C-alpha cells in the first residue's frame, strides 16, 4: 500500500471522460494494482479511480507541462480496456509505503455495494434495452453509483440506497445538475433505486423528474422471476 498526498490534477480517459482540476488530494495505490483519488470531504468514496488489473507508469513531463509546474506524470492503464487515468503531480507533500499483508475481507449481506453489483449485472431491471456504462462513475463531487444508457442511447444516472430517503434524492439531484453540464452526456435523467423508499423521498423524486425503482434484494441474488417496480 502506498499513500501519497500531492497537489495534482487528474484526467480519466475512456468510454466517458472526466477531469479533476488542480487540488491537494490523497492518492492511494494498492498492491492489487488499483489506484484511488480521494479528497478531504464530500464523500467516503474516491473522486476517481482505476480498478485492477492496471499498470502504473511514471514518466517525465513534456516541456509544456514542465512550464505549467508539473513534476511527474502518472499514467494508470487498465488491463482489460483502453481506459486510462492520467495524474499530473505538481508537489508531493507526503509519501507512505507499507505492506499490509493478506486481509480476510468483510462479509456483507444486503448492503448498498451488493445492490450496486447486482443491478450492474442485471441492468435491464432499469428497463428494456438498457446497457451499463460504468459503476462508480467519477465526478468532482463524488462517484455516481451507476451510469447507464437507455434503449434510445440517453444517459441515465442511478443512485442506490438500502433505504431511500430525502437525502438520497438530494444527492442524486446534485449529480444530475453536474452531469447535465457535460455536452457529451446530457440530457441525463435520474433513477433513485432502493430496497425501501420512504413516501417523502418518492414525492420529492417525482417533483424533480426522478424515477424511483424498488429493488427486491432476494430475487436479485437468485435472479429468479425477478420483478421490480419502476414508478
From Swiss-Prot:
UniProt GO MF annotations: DNA binding; single-stranded DNA endodeoxyribonuclease activity
Subcellular localization(s) per the UniProt record: Cytoplasm
Main subcellular location of this protein, as a coarse class: cytoplasm
Gene3D superfamilies: 2.70.180.20, 3.40.1350.10
Example of a GO cellular component annotation carried by this entry: cytoplasm
Entry's EC annotation: 3.1.-.-
Keyword annotations: Cytoplasm, DNA-binding, Endonuclease, Hydrolase, Nuclease
DNA-binding keyword on record: yes
Function: Cleaves both 3' and 5' ssDNA extremities of branched DNA structures.
NCBIfam families, per the entry: PRK03298.1 (NF002876)
Similarity remark: Belongs to the NucS endonuclease family.
Protein name as annotated: Endonuclease NucS
Source organism of the structure: Kocuria rhizophila (strain ATCC 9341 / DSM 348 / NBRC 103217 / DC2201)
Lineage: Bacteria, Bacillati, Actinomycetota, Actinomycetes, Micrococcales
Amino acid at each position: 500500500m502506498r499513500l501519497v498526498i500531492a497537489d495534482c490534477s487528474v484526467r480519466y480517459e475512456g468510454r466517458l471522460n472526466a477531469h479533476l482540476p488542480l487540488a491537494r488530494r490523497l492518492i492511494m495505490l494498492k498492491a492489487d494494482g488499483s489506484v484511488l483519488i480521494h479528497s478531504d470531504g464530500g464523500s467516503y468514496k474516491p473522486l476517481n479511480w482505476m480498478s485492477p488489473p492496471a499498470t502504473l507508469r511514471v514518466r517525465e513531463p513534456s516541456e509544456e507541462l514542465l512550464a505549467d509546474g508539473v513534476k511527474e506524470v502518472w499514467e494508470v492503464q487498465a488491463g482489460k480496456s483502453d481506459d486510462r487515468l492520467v495524474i499530473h503531480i505538481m508537489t508531493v507533500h507526503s509519501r507512505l509505503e507499507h505492506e499490509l499483508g493478506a486481509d480476510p475481507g468483510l462479509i456483507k449481506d444486503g448492503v448498498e455495494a451488493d445492490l450496486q453489483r447486482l443491478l450492474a449485472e442485471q441492468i435491464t431491471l432499469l428497463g428494456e434495452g438498457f446497457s451499463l456504462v460504468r459503476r462508480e462513475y467519477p465526478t468532482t463531487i463524488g462517484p455516481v453509483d451507476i451510469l447507464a444508457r437507455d434503449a434510445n442511447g440517453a444517459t441515465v444516472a442511478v443512485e442506490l440506497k438500502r433505504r431511500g430517503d430525502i437525502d438520497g434524492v438530494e444527492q442524486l439531484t446534485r449529480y444530475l445538475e453536474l452531469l447535465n453540464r457535460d455536452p457529451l452526456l446530457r440530457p441525463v435523467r435520474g433513477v433513485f433505486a432502493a430496497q425501501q423508499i420512504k413516501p417523502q423521498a418518492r414525492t420529492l423524486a417525482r417533483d424533480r423528474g426522478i424515477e424511483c425503482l424498488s429493488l427486491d434484494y432476494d430475487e436479485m441474488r437468485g435472479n429468479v422471476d425477478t420483478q421490480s417496480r419502476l414508478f
